[in-house]
Swiss-Prot record:
Annotated membrane topology: Multi-pass membrane protein
TM segment ranges: 23-41, 46-65, 72-90, 94-113, 120-142, 157-179, 362-381, 385-404, 411-433, 438-455, 462-481, 496-515
PANTHER family the record matches: MULTIDRUG RESISTANCE PROTEIN MDTO, P-HYDROXYBENZOIC ACID EFFLUX PUMP SUBUNIT-RELATED
Main localization of the protein described in the UniProt heading: membrane
Identification of the protein by name: Uncharacterized transporter YdhK
Keyword Cytoplasm among record annotations: no
Gene name as annotated: ydhK
One GO term describing the cellular component: plasma membrane
């Protein structure tokens, strides 16, 4: 007994925490209920209800609601498209094939073009149409089209309802609590990030930390969406939460700007590091106030009016303190449940994002070509299991066109299908042939699914494999009503599914997604185009919108293995963002002195000469940097205080642009170019 006790403790059932048990039981009961209800509703393929319940098994209430709404909308759209296409083209195989391939290719483009629920809905509409329409090629009566379509949609809705009901019975962590906790943690992490970036060193760890902070803030936007659906309180506070995310992005920009000034400041005060550490320690306290912070940073107040570098750093540091204290106060009010009208915060739109249209179109073309090749082969050889291959190929192309590593995902799916083929053969022809009642089969499924759900949570490295095994198990076991046990059909169908995924893998290998270097160049060019727009009199993006758009560009390569492409995308984003903040500050800067106003306009025109959508002009850049330095030195000796403030702003612009002196040549990102990883 002593020997067996440690072994029992290492089993997934004894290792599981209460939260893991709640998650596993909730999802397992939902899947079993979905299968049961689909059977009693006499739906012909009830396993789709079980699969639908597995797909919407999100760990939070808001995630389940938002995912369910997207799934219902996508299923209805896909079913409608399948009915229209099949109803008009079913007697013409080639027209049917091209129409379906075009629709699923369009859905692939759309899910890459949009984000969150809209992207998920288009994903569902693409492979729902494939699930419904491709098996229709074997039907004889046209009236069966409606029966098949409504059965698939009903099965999906049954699974969603069961998943939602179990989430209400066994609820998990509140989305609002998760969002507020993430906001508070990020608020505290920004101080640690400031302490790291304001060091004089330049290492890869700084660049990685900057990318990590940007990615985490943008990820919190997904938590905001889930909280929006989970509780009416967060729907009322949605604009405020958006503003908080923008403020955290602005704090990140200010930290980067202060770092750039410290690196370009020849003689900073000797006590600057000591004062900064005291400041960060005070800001980390829950009850930090403006008076105490002002006393701490007072030793850094510039004494020489002509020292524009010191003045620029001082003004930006004060702005950072004010913004951080304001965010702390607003976070406290939101967490304490204060009424919306008592929280004085500037309402801002949602975070902006950029769509790589070239990559989205290429993904749609790849899907169209893949389905056309498989369909042509099926028609040419009269392959009865061709619909199965087409369905899995459609699912693979739609799902993995937007992931960072499609080959890894497709290889994992292939591994899943092989394992499920072997397992489903044993279950179907070893167990199910001996079962006469549904409850007997559920007695087998329940402990199996509970164990698989627990293993998915306890084995993070294999979570993707366990998740796919759970989702695809229903379609491989194929629990139909009435049950069918035909070994030849079983073998052909499973082979077709594996072949469909294999051809999809081949399509990704031939019609490869753009390399990270190519994507980086496209993002950099889009950044420059948007920045040139910022220099116009009436820019299309506000300061906050351009900031969030820039950070969205930077985050697109956060998982890339091409360090050079990531580094230059981050550098361009930081440079253009710092320059845009200076431009907006120059616009807001006013003086009664007409010569000073003309100097301000000259600085903005110098930026237009340096920057274009295609590249940065190196000769004008060097001349511009010299001219900006000359302007700063001249204004420093001006008798008006406004001139000193203008010199400080222009020096910030000089610090930001100096990073581009080693920019790579147009259209290249070659490792041969000298680059320093200064984030």
């Amino acid at each position: 007994m002593k020997l067996s006790l440690p072994a029992l403790r290492n089993t997934p059932w004894f290792k599981a925490t209460s939260g893991q048990w709640r998650y596993a039981l909730r999802n397992t009961i939902a899947m079993c209920l979905a299968l049961t209800f689909a059977y009693y509703l006499n739906l012909d393929e009830p396993y789709w209800a079980m699969t639908s319940a597995a797909v919407v098994s999100f760990p939070t209430v808001g995630g389940v609601i938002s995912k369910s709404l997207g799934r219902i909308a996508g299923s209805l759209l896909g079913a409608t498209a399948a009915l229209i296409i099949a109803g008009h083209t079913l007697n013409e195989p080639w027209l049917f094939l091209f129409s379906m391939a075009a629709w699923i290719g369009f859905c692939t483009w759309a899910c890459a073009h949009f984000t969150n629920n809209a992207a998920y809905a288009f994903q569902l509409s693409g492979y729902t149409a494939a699930i419904i329409a491709f098996p229709m090629v074997n039907i004889v009566e046209i009236t069966q089209l409606w029966d098949i379509a409504q059965a698939r949609v009903c099965e999906v809705i049954v699974g969603i309802l069961c998943g939602g009901m179990m989430m209400m019975i066994l609820p998990s962590t509140s989305d609002g609590t998760a969002l507020l906790t993430a906001l508070k943690n990020m608020h505290a992490r920004l101080l640690e990030h400031a302490s790291l970036l304001w060091q004089p060193e330049t290492t890869d760890a700084i660049r990685s930390a900057h990318e990590g902070v940007i990615g985490q803030i943008l990820t919190m936007n997904l938590l905001r969406i889930q909280a929006f659906w989970s509780h009416y309180r967060f729907r009322r506070q949605n604009a405020l939460l958006n503003a908080l995310l923008h403020q955290q992005l602005r704090l990140t920009s200010v930290i980067s700007s202060l770092r750039r000034m410290l690196l370009n400041w020849p003689t900073p005060p000797e006590n600057s590091r000591e004062v900064i550490e005291q400041l960060l320690a005070e800001l980390a306290k829950p009850r930090a106030d403006s008076y105490t912070v002002a006393r701490i940073i007072a030793p850094l107040c510039p004494q020489d009016e002509q020292d524009y570098r010191h003045l620029a750093f001082w003004q930006r540091l004060r702005y950072f303190c004010q913004l951080y204290l304001r965010s702390s106060r607003q976070l406290y009010l939101i967490e304490s449940g204060a009424p919306v009208d008592q929280i004085h915060i500037r309402r801002t739109p949602g975070l902006a994002r950029h769509t790589d249209n070239a990559e989205a179109i290429w993904s749609g073309v790849r899907t169209f070509c893949t389905l056309t090749v498989i369909g042509a082969w099926s028609i040419g050889v009269q392959w009865e299991s061709g619909p199965g291959a087409l369905t899995l190929a459609a699912i693979s192309c739609v799902l993995y066109s937007i992931v960072a590593t499609p080959f890894k995902s497709l290889s994992l799916l292939m591994r899943t299908l092989v394992l499920l083929s072997l397992f489903s053969f044993v279950v179907k022809f070893g167990l199910m042939v001996q079962i006469t009642d549904l409850w007997q089969f559920l007695l087998f499924l329940f402990p199996l699914f509970v164990t698989m759900q627990l293993l998915k949570l306890q084995m993070p490295k294999l979570a993707g494999l366990w998740g796919q095994l759970i989702v695809f198990m229903g379609s491989f076991i194929a629990v139909t009503n009435p049950p069918v046990y035909d070994f030849a059909d079983f073998l052909n169908d499973n082979t077709a599914k594996i072949v469909g995924v294999a051809i999809s893998w081949l399509a990704f290998a031939i019609l490869r997604p753009g390399s990270d270097a190519v994507k980086s160049r496209r993002h950099i060019r889009a950044l420059r185009r948007d920045f040139v727009d910022q220099l116009s009199r009436h820019p299309s993006h506000s300061e906050s919108e351009f900031e969030s758009l820039t950070y969205h560009h930077v985050s697109q390569l956060s998982n890339s293995q091409d360090a050079l492409a990531r580094r230059w995308l981050l550098r361009w984003g930081v440079v253009l963002l710092n320059c845009s903040h200076v431009v907006w500050q120059l616009r807001a800067w006013e003086s009664r002195s007409d010569p000073l106003s003309r100097v301000r306009d000259i600085c903005i025109s110098l930026l237009r000469d340096v920057m274009s959508e295609r590249d940065v002009q190196q000769r004008p850049l060097a001349v511009t940097l010299q001219e900006l330095q000359r302007i700063c030195d001249t204004l420093a000796h001006h008798h008006q205080p406004a001139a000193h403030e203008l010199a400080a702003i222009i020096w910030r612009l000089h610090c930001s642009l100096s990073q581009l002196e080693q920019a790579p040549a147009q259209g290249t990102l070659s490792p041969g170019y000298l680059m320093t990883p200064q984030a």
